């Protein structure tokens, strides 16, 4: 039977080759071929994905259960910690841009040399309805003014040791909105500890690693090491010092006289309580092992070693937060993906550590739940481009005060507002999007500020290290293909469990 013919080729034959586009697919700045960059970005995405690694599900689930059990033991030691909390778990640590904490010292940790994968866990201490807040209209911070009672709980008495003086002259700036929101979070009950964690009757004195800050160097024991896996050298500037307690005024029903909840003291209490529990743990065979805990810029970083080969080191940034119902006045209510605020809208207050913070009592506004919902609406090629740019940026910002990782995440949202969705969704444009994000970041570092995505009229600041980072970024931008190849090779080594090779002699 004769075959049908389209032109001069049978219909079952191969399609004609696509026309070559070498003259239009070259990066003007570096001369790199965009097609090669896109292929490297896709390969990096495959290598950095833990979903295809050896037994990742069991490792991650055990580690998550271990952390939740640890928080349950914290509640047993100090009832102020909520017995049941609606936790929000984010992939990526704070040093990878999961949250905005300003340009604060975040410790010496670097993904690869010190840990294989990072996560951020927001732990609400309690919830407010927004009437207790006093927003600073010129910044991204707020004061939490505590009344005598919240939902029948003597909240002021409970947090007596973390209170500061009232803040005069501020006003309440929270209101509720009527639009809709769709965001999902992780819920976990932490009232019953799992079998992965057991506790001694009395704390055990643990030997400190000589390469870490000893207990005598920090009055609040801001670094605790329970093993010798990673020789993390923590300089004194990398560790948040204990805040000086402020005098507490006598209780008064006038809101202007309500004492404020000091974020620095809450962060210090959170770490001290968690460290006391961590020092009293009994290792359980087959369970993750907590080997390091330290406090940085208002949050606590813990490192867990997985029990089975290939052994991995997981980083969890635990941050005590206050959950606030409502929506801040002047905040964005819609995005390219739809409404952000609804009748059930809420946001968080986190203990920020930036130098622009008005005082030690101030809390930074955080929209992690909304960002989680936005991320689900970002086209996959753009997410790949962002992950690649983040991987290239990682060695440049390790150990610095630069806020570049979260600035890069914010540029991701602005790109979705500015560029056509069809362009961002095309896989072949991942290389161009990655270069575009790096170029935009360079312009932000040069300008020193970036408009806040959620808070209209507010600015994110780049930090004191932006000038040095700008020079490093320019050198990287001159040969992005080489930087991507190096990132792919590092990801391959880490995927095989090589990220821990030679760290602390391989002991976990």
UniProtKB/Swiss-Prot annotation:
Transmembrane segments: 261-278
This protein's encoding gene: TMEM102
Protein name according to UniProt: Transmembrane protein 102
Segments for region (Disordered): 170-231
SMART domains: Mab-21 (SM01265)
GO BP, one annotated term: regulation of mitochondrial outer membrane permeabilization involved in apoptotic signaling pathway
Function: Selectively involved in CSF2 deprivation-induced apoptosis via a mitochondria-dependent pathway.
A single cellular component GO annotation: mitochondrion
Residues in the Cytoplasmic compartment per record: 279-508
Assembly mode: Interacts with CSF2RB; this interaction occurs preferentially in the absence of CSF2.
The organism of origin for this protein: Homo sapiens
Gene3D superfamilies xrefs: 1.10.1410.40
């Amino acid at each position: 039977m004769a075959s049908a013919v389209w032109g001069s080729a049978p219909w079952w034959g191969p399609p004609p080759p696509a026309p070559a586009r070498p003259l239009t697919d070259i990066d003007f700045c570096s001369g790199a071929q965009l097609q090669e960059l896109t292929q490297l970005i896709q390969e990096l995405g495959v290598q950095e994905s833990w979903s295809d690694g050896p037994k990742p599900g069991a490792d991650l689930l055990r580690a998550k259960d271990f952390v939740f059990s640890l928080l349950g033991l914290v509640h047993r030691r100090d009832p102020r910690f909520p017995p049941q909390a609606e936790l929000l778990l984010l992939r990526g640590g704070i040093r990878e841009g999961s949250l905005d904490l300003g340009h604060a010292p975040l410790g010496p940790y670097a993904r690869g040399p010190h840990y294989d994968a990072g996560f951020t866990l927001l732990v609400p201490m309690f919830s407010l309805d927004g009437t207790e807040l006093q927003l600073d209209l010129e910044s991204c911070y707020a004061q939490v003014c505590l009344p005598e009672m919240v939902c029948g709980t003597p909240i002021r008495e409970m947090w007596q040791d973390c209170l500061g003086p009232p803040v005069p002259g501020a006003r309440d700036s929270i209101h509720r909105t009527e639009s809709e929101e769709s965001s999902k979070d992780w819920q976990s009950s932490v009232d019953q500890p799992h079998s992965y964690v057991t506790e001694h009757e009395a704390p055990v004195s643990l030997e400190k690693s000589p390469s870490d800050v000893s207990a005598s160097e920090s009055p609040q024991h801001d670094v605790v090491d329970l093993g010798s896996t990673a020789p993390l050298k923590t300089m004194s500037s990398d560790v948040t010092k204990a805040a000086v307690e402020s005098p507490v005024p006598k209780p008064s029903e006038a809101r202007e006289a309500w004492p404020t909840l000091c974020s620095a003291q809450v962060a210090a209490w959170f770490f001290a309580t968690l460290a006391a529990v961590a020092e009293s743990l009994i290792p359980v065979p087959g369970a993750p092992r907590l080997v390091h805990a330290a406090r940085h810029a208002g949050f606590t970083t813990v490192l867990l070693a997985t029990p089975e080969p290939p052994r991995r080191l997981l980083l969890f940034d635990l941050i005590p937060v206050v959950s606030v119902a409502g929506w801040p006045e002047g905040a964005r209510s819609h995005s390219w993906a739809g409404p952000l605020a609804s009748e059930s809208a809420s946001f968080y207050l986190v203990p920020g550590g930036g130098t622009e913070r008005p005082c030690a009592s101030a809390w930074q506004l955080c929209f992690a739940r909304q960002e989680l919902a936005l991320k689900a609406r970002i086209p996959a090629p753009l997410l790949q481009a962002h992950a690649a740019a983040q991987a290239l940026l990682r060695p440049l910002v390790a150990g610095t005060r630069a806020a570049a990782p979260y600035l890069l995440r914010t540029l991701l949202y602005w790109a979705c507002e500015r560029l056509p969705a069809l362009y961002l969704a095309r896989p072949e444009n991942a290389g161009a999007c990655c270069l575009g994000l790096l170029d935009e970041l360079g312009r932000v570092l040069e300008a020193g500020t970036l408009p806040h995505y959620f808070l209209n009229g507010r600015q994110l600041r780049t930090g004191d290290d932006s000038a040095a980072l700008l020079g490093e970024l320019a050198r990287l931008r001159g040969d992005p293909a080489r930087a991507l190849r190096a990132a792919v090779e590092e990801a391959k080594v880490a995927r095989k469990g090589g990220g821990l090779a030679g760290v602390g002699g391989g002991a976990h």
